[in-house]
Curated annotation (Swiss-Prot):
The record marks E153 as: Transition state stabilizer. Pathway: Cofactor biosynthesis; pyridoxine 5'-phosphate biosynthesis; pyridoxine 5'-phosphate from D-erythrose 4-phosphate: step 5/5. It is found in: Cytoplasm. This is Pyridoxine 5'-phosphate synthase. The lineage of its organism: Bacteria, Pseudomonadati, Pseudomonadota, Gammaproteobacteria, Enterobacterales.
Amino acid sequence: MAELLLGVNIDHIATLRNARGTAYPDPVQAAFIAEQAGADGITVHLREDRRHITDRDVRILRQTLDTRMNLEMAVTEEMLAIAVETKPHFCCLVPEKRQEVTTEGGLDVAGQREKMRDACKRLTDAGIQVSLFIDADEEQIKAAAEVGAPFIEIHTGCYADAKTDAEQAQELVRIAKAATFAASLGLKVNAGHGLTYHNVKAIAAIPEMHELNIGHAIIGRAVMTGLKDAVAEMKRLMLEARG
């Protein structure tokens, strides 16, 4: 069974800051609190439109984090150049549409193998570990292995958004099978998107899961209980699922 880690996404600290154009709340301070509360890493998504996290945030976080930085980004020349210069510990390559509220699905790795292979090589050559954000689909998982990504992050949005218990159970089986298949190919398996305090334990219980990246639910809880308690409670639930 893989060690289970929690990556805390702090994008929405920046969303709140940018809503008023102020210098607060500070994502760097939030990252420090999350680390104190048990976060194993900090995730930020530098979007092309800079709607929350900024280039400055990325630079300062890379210099100040005690744990690991996971930079989510689109596969563009601009973002690849920023990553190579900044050198986060991890880069998670994601699809991105300017009009979307949040990432809506996984990368089509199988449909753009050469582009993904080139991106993975460029990042790997810079000493960055690469993850591909994909749906729980065997074709995409095989493609991820073929293009040289050591990690995948399974998109859990369909599981999180399921309307019925039966639909959610079906999605859980699909994710678990995908995790097993990916591990059989030598890939390390992360997961994220839409995970909450109510649905995280079933995903955390999947033996192959290495890291869960969770943001919106934790930041939402933090508004009510404080960030330190919100992070600690999510980590407790995840580890409880492992017995």
